[in-house]
């Protein structure tokens, strides 16, 4: 029988994957907004102090929804994001490293809360300073189109490094952790750092965008058939993308020789995003002799919730070993 803590862990893991299956959710009601927040000291900062770039044609209004009817008011997802942000969770015992965490949502929404959750809390318990990113979505009319989420990710990792001194971590020990479609955003951040996705706006944009390591959990990786996740591919590239577009946004096809070490975790029984996404990226790293660690669990589904214990997700323990390993 699952303990209460493992049930909470399962909900959090499924939340990180939310949007891949896209179950219905209800708008936040006034009484929900009035309920106490679970937030305990998380700082929230806008990514773009003067507004996100390229929004002249954006008309959709940002929404916050509950992921389940009458559920936890902090278990939310964002749609039509116009003002992306970073929420910061500080560890009690810092280990000198930071993680930029990118949740999923099938590129149709972002399953994230300003209150944080058990995953960022678990990473902080391991000593990481954790930055949780909310990001813009490609179908909302932004000028950058399918690169809009990459713009936010590049800006976010620069903002993370800009906080290194005052938060007490090494700017050369900044990893990215992405989940589901957020894994695709993280994968692009880890492979497309040789070009700026946006024009610099301040001195922060002089900082590098290459993460020092990347963890991709049950990730969307490829846009190529037969393993592309249809929901993410359609939201990212439209209903009739060309072969060239599919190729351009397939992470495994654009690995630079100086890609950071990659950690991949997926379940063989994932019926939402095929584990072959992770296999394709591992094989591509193997061809180039790039550092990459792959874990395929027999069971776990999309979210790897079934391979969690009362002590936390199995992938988190393995990721911690990977990120703290001497290289």
Label each PLM-derived region with a short phrase.
Residues 110-119, 133-170, 307-314:
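Catalytic nucleophile-loop/oxyanion-hole region of alpha/beta-hydrolase
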Residues 158-228:
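Primarily recognizes the serine-hydrolase "nucleophile elbow" in alpha/beta-hydrolase
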Residues 264-266:
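Short beta-strand/loop motif that positions the catalytic acidic residue
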Residues 279-327:
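C-terminal catalytic histidine-bearing segment of alpha/beta-hydrolase fold enzymes
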Residues 1-24:
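N-terminal secretory signal peptides and thylakoid transit peptides that target proteins
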Residues 96-104:
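Short beta-strand element of the alpha/beta-hydrolase
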Residues 65-73, 203, 219-254, 260, ...:
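Mobile cap/lid helix-loop segments that gate and shape the active-site cleft of serine hydrolases
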Residues 272-277:
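Conserved alpha/beta-hydrolase "acid-adjacent" motif
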């Amino acid at each position: 029988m699952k303990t209460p803590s493992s049930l909470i862990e399962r909900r959090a893991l499924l939340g990180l994957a939310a949007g891949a299956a896209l179950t219905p959710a209800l708008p936040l009601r006034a009484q929900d907004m009035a309920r106490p927040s679970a937030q305990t000291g998380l700082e929230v900062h806008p990514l773009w102090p003067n507004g996100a770039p390229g929004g002249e044609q954006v008309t959709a209004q940002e929404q916050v929804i509950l992921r389940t009817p009458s559920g936890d008011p902090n278990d939310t997802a964002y749609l039509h994001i116009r003002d992306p942000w970073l929420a910061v969770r500080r560890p009690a015992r810092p280990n000198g490293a930071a993680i930029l965490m990118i949740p999923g949502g099938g590129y149709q929404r972002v399953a994230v809360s300003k209150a944080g959750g058990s995953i960022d809390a678990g990473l902080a318990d391991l000593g990481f300073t954790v930055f949780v990113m909310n990001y813009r979505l490609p179908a909302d009319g932004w000028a950058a189109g399918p690169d809009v989420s990459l713009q936010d990710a590049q800006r976010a990792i620069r903002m993370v490094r800009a906080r290194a001194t005052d938060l007490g971590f090494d700017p050369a020990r900044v990893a990215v952790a992405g989940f589901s479609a957020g894994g695709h955003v993280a994968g692009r951040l880890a492979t497309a750092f040789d070009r700026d996705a946006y024009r610099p706006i301040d001195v922060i944009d002089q900082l590098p965008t290459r993460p020092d390591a990347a963890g991709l959990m049950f990730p969307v990786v490829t846009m190529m058939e037969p393993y592309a996740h249809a929901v993410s591919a359609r939201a990212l590239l439209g209903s009739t993308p060309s072969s060239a577009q599919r190729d351009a946004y397939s992470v495994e096809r654009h690995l630079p020789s100086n890609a950071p070490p990659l950690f991949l975790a997926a379940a063989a029984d994932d019926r939402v995003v095929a584990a072959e996404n992770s296999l394709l990226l591992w094989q591509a790293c193997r061809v180039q002799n790039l550092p990459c660690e792959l874990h395929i669990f027999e069971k776990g589904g999309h979210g790897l919730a079934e391979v969690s214990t009362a002590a936390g997700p199995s992938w988190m323990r393995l990721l911690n070993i990977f990120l703290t390993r001497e290289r």
